[in-house]
Amino acid sequence: MQPSSNNCYDTGLREECGVFGIYDLDGADVSPSIYYGLSALQHRGQESCGIAVSDTSGPKGHVKSYKGLGLVNEVFKESKLEELSGNIGIGHVRYSTTGSTTVENAQPLVLNYLKGSLALAHNGNLVNAMELREQMENTGAIFHTSIDSEIIAYGIARERVHSKTVEEAILRTVKEIRGAYALVIMSPRKLIGVRDPYGLKPLCIGKRDNAWVLASESCALTSIGAEFVRDVAPGEIVTFDKTGNLKSEFMPVDVKKAHCIFEYIYFARLDSKIDNISVYEARIRGGATLAKTYPVDADLVCGVPDSGLASAKGYSEESGIPFGLAFHKNSYVGRTFIKPTQKERESSVKIKLSVLESVVKGKRIVLVDDSIVRGTTISNLITMLRKAGATEVHVRISSPPFLYPCYFGTDVPSNKQLIASSHSTEEIRQQIGADSLGYMPIEELQNMVGDLPICRACFDSHYPMEVPKQDISALLES
């Protein structure tokens, strides 16, 4: 999700999102389920959210929707949910680029066109968004947002006029787009899920009684009492309609799969399974690898809440050094990684975490975290640990150094903002104030997820597809 430099587009950091959809064939109201599903995906985006619903027994094409800035529980009060009654619906959580936190850019997007209505929610990023947008504008398209999700929605609506079904229109549209996308789409009588052929972004299927569910992560299924059925396969389009059956077809492409490894390192919730791999177990394996690769004499292994905790436990189990909690987390402060400005990130670190002095005083600490992007968080935490009496702080990072930008929707920005692109490991160690620093060796990264093919381009620049030559900040958002 990148901004353009033109007028309404803004320069800044990229975003990650969560999508959710449900179709209850018994006619039950789904808006409460969407609310709880989005709440379970809140870690994937905290700046805006939205819900769009329809009633398959009502007037064809009538969609009710509401979007707002803030957390799910802030935007959707009970009275608002009561206005969004329907037995089919989709939802979205988002965090945005600097300056683009607007309701207009919140999702789901709802289009009314010749064939009826279409609502769409998107997680990911298109690498040819500017090219497609220019082509569409040259043929009369008028866009109302600065997000590339609108390009997808507009493309489907255009192709639908010449297609027998929405699915056919989707197939025609995805032939033209390049990038990462997990989509949930609601047409008047169908719920549709789409996953890009590389499998870069996650999407799974669940079932609760006579309702079908789509979600970015399995934790959202659990939150509404749905059973996990399976992941949507890379390149697959799944459809749920009044027959109650799951219909599947695949894009006619054959590409090497490249699942985003950062889902397992940081983004996904600990209790989720993605592509049949437990996020928790993947992080445990990562921590164990760090212990084997970078052993150190220490008294306590601690993780940075939340995404560093499981890796710290893995380090502890492998090394035999006791595991402990060094920090208390204020759960009412959002992730530092997804704050839109550097100043907000720095202040957020100190408000979000406080040191348990009685635990760390006089101890040699191994501090495990998921990544170092700018160095903001880890430097502050080391200072806090030392002020609380820690005698040594040894940092272990469960990902390799970030050296290259991500073009597919993960908040890994341009090279100038990546500390590892201009500093050696020793220079970073000195800058953050650690006694030692060890990153996950890139050759060991695969061990976290077994034989699952992964994208690790932000570490080695081996992108799974051709990416733009211009700076990433010149791309559209999603």
Where are these regions (language model features)?
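A conserved beta-strand->alpha-helix junction
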Residues: 76, 145, 150-153, 323-334, ...
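Short, glycine/charge-rich flexible loops or terminal/linker lids adjacent to PRPP-binding catalytic cores
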Residues: 320-365, 376-379, 403-409, 413
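Extended, hydrophobic alpha-helical segments in both membrane/secreted and soluble proteins
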Residues: 301, 308-315, 319, 323, ...
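Secondary-structure transition/capping motifs at alpha-helix termini
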Residues: 141, 162-163, 295-299, 317-324, ...
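Mobile, glycine- and charge-enriched loop segments
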Residues: 354-368, 372-373, 397, 472-478
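Conserved short alpha-helical segments that host acidic/polar catalytic motifs at enzyme active sites
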Residues: 1-234, 239-298, 304, 392
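PRPP-dependent phosphoribosyltransferase catalytic core
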Residues: 174, 189, 225-231, 383-478
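Flexible loop/turn segments at secondary-structure boundaries
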Residues: 97-98, 128, 200-201, 221-222, ...
